[in-house]
Curated annotation (Swiss-Prot):
Protein name per the record: 1,4-alpha-glucan branching enzyme GlgB
Active site per UniProt: 411 (nucleophile), 464 (proton donor)
Subunit structure: Monomer.
Enzyme class: transferase
Length: 731
């Protein structure tokens, strides 16, 4: 039987104050008004559809027309209770009627345990409860599918869901706040599986803003700023890699890392295309790892990506999150580890992102002397707030678990550790002890590192920390920050200063090449020749080398060999492996044409390929990287000849002698102390003709005799080519 007559009751309309808040978008519990509610022997159904011309409740085979009361509120009183299920048939002007389950009849999708853990900052899978999640519920009338939305905005006056589904209308989908948690929630039936959405937030400051979801898994392609509902059906093929990762300790393994900015490596490639081309290239060049500059969504394509606006979404510029998974999967199946740059130090002030999210300082510290980073014009996270700390720790775990990422390189750690970092006198506030240390940031970093290594054994966390803060790579249980490694910024600055000088003057700066060994084992180091050295007028590694092209090429080859031989892991920014001559620019990709035009670039690229092969095969270059037992000087003091020489030792008993001639002239009859007599094979000569060098060398090896030298029982006489490196191993 069809019924369309209107039924009335005394509770048809809500209280005027309730109605006013609903219309204004500031009602904290719209579910208490909308949906089905029993009053005596009646059930009242209310629906808030401001632009509808007709709303009908479908109860089984019966139809009940809702009366339009005011301002888009429709209601009907049904003459019975114990309503099990119903649908709404909504008609808009000029449109066909459409039938949908009522969003305001569903229970919250977050439980008390989830909210409690979040409030304490201890929810290790927070991304599974906040954000947007496709869900299905079985009802009396069948399965209802849709998307649940949840967002933290504790000081907001009201929050509504807006998107393509409702014409970006801020009235039709008001959300409810779940008690004192500050989490606003709504399940919306039939929401498109890849639909765009935002949250309309009525801020505590009276300003209404449309915000991207802080936990969005997907986004519109910038410069558009909406979030996109995203789910994954990706099937991984890297089981062997992941099983092996859990058993490894990266500190004691080979790690030579190729640093990549995806947008400018070869412009125009998608994640899926990069899965083929980038993977093949890295395998060919012999790197063990790739480090991706920030892949989390950021507004400006021409940037490195360090001002993140969607921490849980891989940038949509190159494809979907599953496409990014395919890139990681391909690298893993090729034996390449994947590190991503992660930016928990600060975030941009874009009005649609995290800043002043609910009209108050929420993710950022409320004190401007702590909550703003003056150098970058960004906000600083409030590391002491449990919910903010949980947002960041869970984000680290999200990348490690959901995308199988093998490591996080944490950007700008020094700016987190010091309250007075880059601040003028009087522009910062001390900690509770009167010091400059940011104690909350220290606790956050310790928690992040400890949790990440617990949840994902075998991963690596790397700090970009430019000061002498003690214990960066010391375990947290003995007071350290808990990082696996840190960038050795001192080594980078000293080395580049030295090799940039004309060889005539290098002898006066010999200490710049020896100083790093005074502290080489105080932390677990990565030696970075990174993106920071090819931008802002710094030129390139090639451009730093003095002399003509022949001398520049020799200088760059010897620098790279020195980097790979020095204790610590290696990192090299893209393009430097073939001696790119032009500074990086967001306007173009790498200058691959150099490989077609001159032998110097081909020679440098061949050298990097060979030193990576030698490096992986010789544990002396990596297995004792972090202990003094892995290194000893042969001669640190030959400044007159601009020569450095040292031994590297492996945990398997292997040895490697390394000698570097940074003079512009060759040295003949150069006696080098060695640990044993016999034949020593020249496994690397950076001046070899295959690298477009001059071909000066030792015919593949030398014979060491029992003539003590440099405090060692044996020695050999060598020819040292100009601006070169030689690596020798016992034959």
């Amino acid at each position: 039987m069809s019924r369309s007559e209107k039924l009335t009751g005394e509770h048809l309309a809500p209280e005027p104050a309730e109605m006013a808040r609903l219309v204004a978008g500031t009602h904290h519990n719209p579910h208490g008004i909308l949906g089905a509610h029993e009053y005596g022997d009646h059930t009242v159904i209310r629906a808030f559809r401001p632009h509808a011309v007709e709303v009908v409740a479908l109860v089984g085979k019966d139809r009940f027309s809702l009366q339009h009361l005011d301002s888009g509120l429709f209601a009907v009183a049904l003459p019975f209770v114990d309503l099990i299920d119903y649908r709404l048939q909504v008609t808009y002007e000029g449109c066909e009627p459409h039938t949908v389950a009522d969003a305001y009849r569903f229970l919250p999708t977050l439980g008390e345990v989830d909210l409690h853990l979040f409030a304490e900052g201890r929810h290790e899978r927070l991304w599974e409860v906040l954000g947007a999640h496709p869900r299905s519920f079985t009802t009396a009338d069948g399965v209802v599918s849709g998307v649940s939305f949840a967002v933290w905005a504790p000081n907001a006056k009201g929050v509504s869901l807006i998107g393509e589904f409702n014409g970006w209308n801020g009235h039709e989908a008001p959300m409810r706040v779940l008690g004192p948690s500050g989490v606003w929630e709504l399940f919306w039936p039939d929401f498109p599986c890849d639909g765009l959405y935002k949250f309309r937030v009525h801020g505590a400051d009276g300003v209404v803003t449309d915000r991207a979801d802080p936990f969005a898994f997907g986004t519109e392609v910038p410069p558009q700023t909406a979030s996109r509902v995203t789910s994954s059906d990706y099937t991984w093929g890297d089981d062997d890699w992941m099983a092996g990762r859990a058993l490894r300790n990266p500190v004691n393994e080979a790690m030579s890392t190729y640093e990549v900015h995806l947008g400018s490596w070869r412009p125009g490639l998608s994640y899926r295309q990069l899965a083929r081309e980038l993977t093949d290239y890295i395998v060919d060049q012999g790197f063990t790892h790739v480090e991706l500059l920030p892949v989390a969504e950021h507004p400006f394509a021409g940037s490195w990506g360090y001002q993140v606006t969607s921490y849980y979404a891989p940038t949509s510029r190159f494809g979907t999150p599953d496409d990014f998974r395919a890139l990681v999967d391909a690298l893993h199946q090729a034996g390449i580890g994947v590190i991503v740059d992660w930016v928990p130090a600060h975030f941009p002030k874009d009005a649609w992102a995290l800043g002043r999210f609910d009209g108050t300082p929420l993710y950022e510290h409320s004190d401007p002397k702590r909550g703003e980073q003056l150098d970058w014009g960004t906000y600083v996270f409030d590391f002491g707030r449990p919910e903010v700390r949980n947002f960041l720790v869970a984000n680290a775990l999200y990348w490690l678990q959901e995308f199988h990422i093998d490591g996080l390189r944490v950007d700008a750690v020094a700016s987190m550790l010091y309250l007075d970092y880059s601040r003028p006198e009087g522009g910062w506030t001390p900690n509770v002890h009167g010091g400059r240390e940011n104690l909350e940031a220290v606790q956050f970093l310790q928690e992040m590192n400890a949790t990440a290594h617990k949840v994902a054994p075998g991963i690596v966390t790397i700090a970009e920390e430019s000061t002498s803060w003690p214990g960066v790579t010391r375990p947290t249980n003995i007071g350290g920050l808990g990082f696996s490694m840190k960038w050795n910024m001192g080594w980078m600055h000293d080395t580049l200063d030295y090799v940039s000088r004309d060889p005539v003057y290098r002898s006066y700066h010999h200490h710049e090449m020896t100083f790093s060994m005074l502290y080489a084992f105080s932390e677990n180091y990565v030696l970075p020749l990174s993106h920071d050295e090819v931008v802002h007028g710094k030129g390139t590694l090639w451009g730093r080398m003095p002399g003509n092209n022949h001398v520049k090429a020799a200088g760059l080859r010897s620098l790279l060999a020195y980097q790979w031989a020095h204790p610590g892991k290696q990192l090299l920014f893209m393009g430097q492996e073939f001696g790119q001559r032009a500074e990086w620019s967001e306007q173009r990709g790498l200058d691959w044409f150099q490989l077609d035009e001159n032998g110097f670039s081909n020679g440098i690229q061949r050298l990097v390929r060979d030193i990576n092969d030698i490096y992986r095969c010789h544990p002396a270059l990596w297995s004792l990287d972090t202990t003094p037992e892995g290194y000893s000087w042969i001669d640190a003091n030959d400044s007159a000849n601009n020569v450095l020489s040292f031994m590297r030792y492996g945990s398997d008993g292997s040895v490697l002698a390394c000698v570097f001639n940074f003079a512009g002239a060759e040295h003949r009859d150069y006696r080098l102390g060695l640990p044993r007599a016999g034949r020593w094979r020249e496994v690397l000569n950076t001046d070899a003709t295959i690298y477009h060098g001059s071909g000066i060398g030792n015919l593949g090896g030398v014979d060491a005799t029992d003539d003590p030298w440099h405090g060692r029982p044996a020695s050999a006489v060598l020819v040292l080519p100009p601006t070169s490196a030689l690596w020798l191993t016992p034959a």
